[in-house]
Amino acid sequence: MPTTTDAASPARPRTGRTAVRAHASVRVERGPQGAPRLAELRSDVPIVLRMTGVSPVRTGARAGAGARADPGPLPTMTVHLVNGAAGPLAGDDLRLDISVGGGVRLVLRSVAATVALPGRGPGPSRLTVTAEVADGGELDLGPEPTVVADGADHQISTDVRLAATARLRLREEILLGRFGEPGGSILSTLRVDVAGGAEGPGADLAGGPFGWVPLLRQELLLGPQVPGLRGPAQLGGARAVGSLLVVAPAWAGAGPDAAVAEGVARLPLTGPGYLVSALADDAVTLRRRLTALADPTG
């Protein structure tokens, strides 16, 4: 039976005056009739998860390990993240675990931006996201921007493990400061591994016969403590920073061509994917620039 914890359940005991710990999770699998099945949906305030849509089973959508070609449109489940409280605040330690089975697609969105705020808790606020995607599965993770308010110190750590034929679309957007204020500090770390390498037959979420192959390691540090942050070699006058990572077996051979436009660049990776990075003055322009180079066949 699916495990669902009501989003209104109280937060876990606080570790200080303002610090709170929360651990939420979502797990989607392929059901007996091919439709996506919500195996687990556990909210933990302030991380509140709500299922908001399920697509019908599409004839011809392929599932299971070993399906190395593009599986086409997959049965899709959509889940939205709702912030159940203000923040995160200093000292908060939040975690979200994501698991996607073979032959299904999970679209994970948020209903609003996350605003990292200063507080009285010990150390920075932290958000840790872990994700695993099985062969033939797909994760589309695209929350609304993280706004780093003046005086905030926030850390985001994202770890993704992909089976050999899994697909991923991961978007991250950061805004330094609310309207009319300077931004705080943020450290964002992204690690993505592919099981057994893109060409390793039989690779699975245990790492496959060839173990885990790093696809991307990216660390981004922004804030007033960074020397030259507003210089032409870094942000210049931009206050919005974003990236879009696309991973699919179709890019295991020759990746897409590199491309550059105003405020945005697309770079192929040594592996089955490519990375789009962009700068902008505001969130709307940032999203538009990321989208412009997101599809190399368009």
Swiss-Prot record:
Family: Belongs to the UreD family.
Role description: Required for maturation of urease via the functional incorporation of the urease nickel metallocenter.
GO molecular function (one): nickel cation binding
Keyword Chaperone: yes
Cellular component GO terms, alphabetical: cytoplasm
Subcellular location: Cytoplasm
Superkingdom: Bacteria
UniProt keyword terms in alphabetical order: Chaperone, Cytoplasm, Nickel insertion
Record protein name field: Urease accessory protein UreD
Species for this entry: Frankia alni (strain DSM 45986 / CECT 9034 / ACN14a)
